[in-house]
From Swiss-Prot:
Keywords assigned: Secreted
Biological role: GRF is released by the hypothalamus and acts on the adenohypophyse to stimulate the secretion of growth hormone.
Keyword Secreted on entry: yes
Organism: Cyprinus carpio
GO molecular function (one): pituitary adenylate cyclase activating polypeptide activity
PANTHER family per record: GLUCAGON-FAMILY NEUROPEPTIDE, PITUITARY ADENYLATE CYCLASE-ACTIVATING POLYPEPTIDE
GO cellular component: extracellular region; neuron projection; perikaryon
GO BP: adenylate cyclase-activating G protein-coupled receptor signaling pathway; neuron projection development; neuropeptide signaling pathway; positive regulation of ERK1 and ERK2 cascade; regulation of protein localization
Coiled-coil annotated residue ranges, if any: none
InterPro entries: Glucagon_GIP_secretin_VIP, VIP/GHRH-like
Protein's gene: ghrh
Pfam families in UniProt: Hormone_2 (PF00123)
The name this protein goes by in its record: Somatoliberin
């Protein structure tokens, strides 16, 4: 049971980390170039 609990917590933390990293790169892209803002809308749809 302890293994399962750790696995779930680890996966949750990993998901939050990757989501934060994705947000960070997204924000960096927006700040980086003005013309790239239009391109950012496509992957989200």
């Amino acid at each position: 049971h302890a293994d399962g609990m750790f696995n779930k917590a680890y996966r949750k933390a990993l998901g939050q980390l990757s989501a934060r990293k994705y947000l960070h790169t997204l924000m960096a892209k927006r700040v980086g170039g003005g013309s790239m803002i239009e391109d950012d809308n496509e992957p989200l749809s």
